[in-house]
């Protein structure tokens, strides 16, 4: 789960808690509306929108039955999750997406691998940047498994003339970069409350399969934000995300 930073910083005050699937739903809205005269639409559209929406669905079981962090008396924030469970969700998300379509599995697996490897060096919005020494072997085993998965899925996609183009490195990385943009843009809203969000930018947003650009976001007040260059098909694009306030358990 994602615990939004408390506006008043009070340890015992209610905190806004967002399921990973609710975060994914916001990512999916961005993906569905991505593309205009400047930005190429996702290709293959359905599969890319699906994996961006479902990229964290390895957390489904934990979303419905979360473990409590004894330090906060709330569900574990995603990065505070016990390491074995964190690694398990990094496998389960590609498992889920592979069942949707092999291409969904490939992009999801790239996302899992990238989270532990600086998002392939393509983003400064890095979340998993430190895993304790005692968990390195377990983490590396999971990551090696994802590389094996990617090789298997690329081979399967290449065997089908209808999907071989999708698996080309430039195309796969353009779609991976689109997932990173939608993910980090959603986290921009999920992690901090209205009134505390600051101007920032997102690097390596794909304009097409060969060209990337940095997209800046600036709060304008009244829950309104400007993006430059603007990447969506609706202007303005109206979105929302769900969550709930939880009081720390006694």
Where in the sequence are the language-model features?
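Short, conserved alpha-helical segments within structured domains
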Residues: 23, 44-49
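Extended, charged low-complexity segments
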Residues: 179-250
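Short pre-active-site segment immediately N-terminal to the catalytic Zn-binding motif
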Residues: 32-46
């Amino acid at each position: 789960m994602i615990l939004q930073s408390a506006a008043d910083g009070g340890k015992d005050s209610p905190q806004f808690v967002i399921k990973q699937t609710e975060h994914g739903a916001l990512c999916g809205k961005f993906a569905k509306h991505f593309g205009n005269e400047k930005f190429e639409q996702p290709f293959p559209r359905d599969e890319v929108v699906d994996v961006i929406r479902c990229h964290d669905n390895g957390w489904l079981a934990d979303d419905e039955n979360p473990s409590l962090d004894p330090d906060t008396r709330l569900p574990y924030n995603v990065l505070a999750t016990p390491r074995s469970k964190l690694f398990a969700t990094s496998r389960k998300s590609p498992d889920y997406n592979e069942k949707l379509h092999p291409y969904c599995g490939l992009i999801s697996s790239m996302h899992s691998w990238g989270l532990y490897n600086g998002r392939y060096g393509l983003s400064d919005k890095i979340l998993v940047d430190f895993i304790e020494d005692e968990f390195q072997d377990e983490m590396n085993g999971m990551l090696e498994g994802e590389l094996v998965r990617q090789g298997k899925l690329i081979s399967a996609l290449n065997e089908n003339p209808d999907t071989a183009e999708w698996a080309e490195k430039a195309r796969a990385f353009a779609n991976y970069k689109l997932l990173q943009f939608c993910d980090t843009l959603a986290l921009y809203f999920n992690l901090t409350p209205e009134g505390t969000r600051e101007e920032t930018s997102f690097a390596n947003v794909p304009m097409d399969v060969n060209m990337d650009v940095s997209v800046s976001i600036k709060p304008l007040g009244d829950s309104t934000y400007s993006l430059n260059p603007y990447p969506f098909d609706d202007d303005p694009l109206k979105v929302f995300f769900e969550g709930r306030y939880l009081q720390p358990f006694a």
